[in-house]
Amino acid sequence: GIPIGFFVICKAIAEQRKTSDDKAQYQLLDGQQRANAIALGFNDWNSIEKDSKQSILWLDLDTNPENMPSDSSRNFLFRVTTPAHPWGYTKNDAEGYLGAAKIRTFLKDKLNLDTSSLKYKRPTTCELAPIDATCPVPVSLLISSMNSNGELDKNLLLDNLSKCKGIWTENAEEAIRGSKFNLSLISEGLRTALNSTILAINTPAKLLEPSLQENQSDNSRSNITNIEHLFQRLNQQGTRLDGEELIYSLIKAYWPEITTSIDRIAQNRMACSRLINLAFRLILTENSGTFSAPLSISTIRRLAKDTEKEQLREEIIAFINEKLDTVCQTVDAILGMKPQSSWGLPPVLYSEIAHQHQDLYLMLTAKKYQELPEDFCRTLTGLITYAAWFGNDQRTIASILYKNLNQQASIEALQKTVKECSHCFARLHQPDEAAAFIALPSSDQPDQIKSWNWWKDLIADSDAAKQQENESQWWGMLCTMRQNKSLLLYAQREFIRKRFSSYDPSRKDLWLEHNRPWDYDHILPAAYTYNIKTNNEFAGFCKQWCNTIGNFRAWPYEDNRSDQAEMAGKKLNQTKLLEDSFISDDE
């Protein structure tokens, strides 16, 4: 095994040189997360103020034992803030998340921000500081205030601090000027950290030598292949990369010259690992004339090592560096995202199509569209979302749609696809038809309301043929629609675009529920139905609706959870709030 905390490196390979790191002597095989964490302590504050997406490492100057976690033996606490949590985390070693009420109170008291306001925007990391800290100071600021003797220079620190903006500066200055500021202790700690030796295991040359089989193949890429095998073995330890991320890492090892293009094009669209997968599949699809399967490690290895595929390799590299951006811009226009159309997908749903329904996104990139009329784009977007949200065989739908659009890019081709793929979709109905079918008992029919059930009252029938017809016509749509939050996000697309304009769906860490800037708020509070022991005869009926999208709205995390028992009429007391929540006046 590899000792904890070590880096694993290897001598840089000439074939992997790229302009941004052509002087690098070694390449990192394992320890990327540790390297990124260490780098936080050296990020220049000026660069942080210019880039709101950076995380910040802080040191709390407070030494009061009463403010330390009960199980801590430290003199000082390190804290971190991230774009998803610009207010920081709880004061312990676990990655605890601060409660919405605490965040809301702090923003109101310190920044005069009302999270319930329609104009509220989440602060950036440089505008905030860890709110669960007393005197936080960026570690990079402390390091930049060290003098040539390796001592923390108090005057230089105060001078650097005076150039900073933020709500934390006043407390920091007061602490530094105060009598309890332990300059020597902090200096000693920083000096120890800066003088520490980071241990790295240099991969033995024998591990990187070509195997007998590779020597016989006369392949110039054998060095990279051996590193690939080593990297895969290392990936069995620590934080594992998923299959697609591992493939992307191997692609970067073989063809580092495409990395810059992929990083740039992926921003605000999708993760780099998905974009590279789609780009390779697109060229492979065009060369074969049939839909290429998702990439595998063996596919990449064959492509890299087969001397007969040199032309294909060059075609892929040229496409990514010269044409991929234009192709993605075309897809942006088709899905109504850039330029933004009233019917277009918000970025989060655009990214969802690419990540959860990649065959559908691949189909959009695989067709060489000319400039398309808006009505066609809108209809095609409708078909894509129909397939994504109500389709049960998206590979078949995408393949048939690709074939039909190759013959003619027209609305007729889209209609033909729906007809040919009717068995691949849940049947949809017009809103008025659905409203009539799901008609609920009236208030003067209390017994029917008490016993109402989705299946019993809508699908089941004493006539077996009638029940089968109800099930085939309606059940698939009802089951999908009730829980599909993508439909909810689309209904609230204007609000999502405006309120969360800085949300970047290409960052996988922001997909996690606790990192996403919105939460799903129960309009009728769940507190009235969840685990409630009551004699209310209508509770069963309410529970069946409480967790459907009809009772949800996407709402800012900081403002949600403040009204867990507040009735809908009170929290939706403005017309604009109703509109943003996609609720009509009569509802």
Each model region followed by its residue ranges:
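Short beta-strand-alpha-helix junction that forms the catalytic/metal-binding core
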Residues: 24-28, 33, 518, 528-561
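Intrinsically disordered, low-complexity N-proximal targeting/linker segments that flank membranes
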Residues: 393-533, 537, 542-545
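Basic- and aromatic-enriched surface patches that contact anionic nucleotides/nucleic acids
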Residues: 2-280, 284, 555, 561
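Short amphipathic alpha-helical segments and their helix-coil junctions
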Residues: 14-18, 188-218, 226-229, 319-352, ...
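Conserved structured core elements
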Residues: 32, 220-224, 228, 240, ...
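A cross-family structural signal marking well-folded subdomains
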Residues: 245-247, 276-465
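Short, hydrophobic/amphipathic alpha-helical patches that form generic packing surfaces
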Residues: 40-43, 228-236, 277-288, 355-368, ...
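Long, cytosolic, alpha-helical-rich C-terminal regions that act as interaction/scaffolding modules
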Residues: 547, 557-587
